Amino acid sequence: MGKMRIDMTANIQQIQQAAQGWSIEVTPAGAAKIDNFAACLAPETTVNVTFLPGTDPMATVAVTKRLHNEGMKAVPHLAARSLKDADQLDGLLAAYRAEAGVDEVLIIGGGVDNPVGAFDNSMQILETGLLQKHGIMRAGVAGHPEGSPDISDIEIADALAAKNAFAKREGVKLYIETQFCFEAPIVLNWEKRVRAAGNELPIRIGIPGPATIKTLFRFAQI
């Protein structure tokens, strides 16, 4: 019994350690359904704010500002293929800094087939130098343990190598945040592959939170 208690305590401690630093994600539409984030989340909880196709970027700014005012750490998405040009990106980053003190963003390609403007991928966003201009020195980039329907495995590997090189060269603290994953072996095998290929960026695993079967099925199709 004593041994079992020790093992159970160790397991609980491991779970608690693994759960530290977690974040959640919210859409502007989802945020509108929440009266006060401070009533359901601990202070300084990291909340990623999505930038979905067809969404007004200023809607993301508004949610980011609200989260900041309610005591959260807001991390807005930057969807490369949904941005018009560097001027729009510059203005958006300026708004995030001025309205919510943002010092971290999550950069993704974005779920559209045809870019609306000058950017096609997240690396192009990084290469503008605008993050550094606005004092944003920490950023997440997408990880794809299950691959991507939009990008070949070779292109994904090349992009990850470029992001590792960028982080070393520019001093920006990049990390990988993966797509939603349901099977641990897939994630673990992917991590071994990218590490063997030279990845040194920290990895945050995306998992779905409590949801209905219908919602989980929709996540699985993303």
Regions found by a protein language model. Give the residues of each.
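Catalytic alpha/beta core domains of metabolic enzymes, predominantly
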Residues: P115-I222
